C-alpha cells in the first residue's frame, strides 16, 4: 500500500460515518423541519388565494345586520344586487368597509 492510500482511507470513512449517522438528534430534527417546511410551502403555493383571503377578511361574510329593521336589510340587499348586476358580461368586485 502506498502512503497516500493509507492516509486517504480513514479520512473518507470518517466523513461517511458522520454523514450517515441518522441517530443524531440534531440530524433527525433538521430532517423533520425540512420536510415540514417543504409540505407547508407546497400547501401555501396551492392554496395561497384562499389562505390570504381568509386572513384579510376573516371568517365574516358581510356586515352584521343585528338590530337593523327588515326593510333596511331588504333595501341593502337590493342595492348590492343591482351593483353586481350592472353589466351581465363583467364581474364587479365590491369591498365593504
UniProtKB/Swiss-Prot annotation:
UniProt keyword terms in alphabetical order: Disulfide bond, Host cell membrane, Host membrane, Host-virus interaction, Hydrogen ion transport, Inhibition of host autophagy by virus, Ion channel, Ion transport, Lipoprotein, Membrane, Palmitate, Phosphoprotein, Signal-anchor, Transmembrane, Transmembrane helix, Transport, Viral ion channel, Virion
One GO cellular component term noted in the UniProt record for this chain: host cell plasma membrane
Site location (Essential for channel activity, possibly by being protonated during channel activation, and by forming the channel gate and the selective filter): 37
Virion surface topological intervals: 1-22
Chain residue ranges for the region called Disordered: 60-83
Subcellular location: Virion membrane; Host apical cell membrane
Phosphoserine: modified positions: 64, 82
Membrane side Intravirion: residue ranges: 44-97
Transmembrane segments: 23-43
GO molecular function: monoatomic ion channel activity; proton transmembrane transporter activity
Miscellaneous section: When the channel is activated, one or more imidazole moieties of His-37 probably become bi-protonated.
Protein family membership: Belongs to the influenza viruses matrix protein M2 family.
Domain-level remarks: Cytoplasmic tail plays an important role in virion assembly and morphogenesis.
Record text on subunit structure and interactions: Homotetramer; composed of two disulfide-linked dimers held together by non-covalent interactions. May interact with matrix protein 1.
Role noted for this protein: Forms a proton-selective ion channel that is necessary for the efficient release of the viral genome during virus entry. After attaching to the cell surface, the virion enters the cell by endocytosis. Acidification of the endosome triggers M2 ion channel activity.
Protein name: Matrix protein 2
Native species: Influenza A virus (strain A/Chicken/Hong Kong/YU22/2002 H5N1 genotype Z)
Gene that encodes it: M
Amino acid at each position: 500500500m502506498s502512503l497516500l492510500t493509507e492516509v486517504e482511507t480513514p479520512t473518507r470513512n470518517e466523513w461517511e460515518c458522520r454523514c450517515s449517522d441518522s441517530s443524531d438528534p440534531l440530524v433527525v430534527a433538521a430532517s423533520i423541519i425540512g420536510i415540514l417546511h417543504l409540505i407547508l410551502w407546497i400547501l401555501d403555493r396551492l392554496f395561497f388565494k384562499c389562505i390570504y383571503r381568509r386572513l384579510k377578511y376573516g371568517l365574516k361574510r358581510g356586515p352584521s345586520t343585528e338590530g337593523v329593521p327588515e326593510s333596511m336589510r331588504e333595501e341593502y340587499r337590493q342595492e348590492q344586487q343591482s351593483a353586481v348586476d350592472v353589466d351581465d358580461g363583467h364581474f364587479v368586485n365590491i369591498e365593504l368597509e
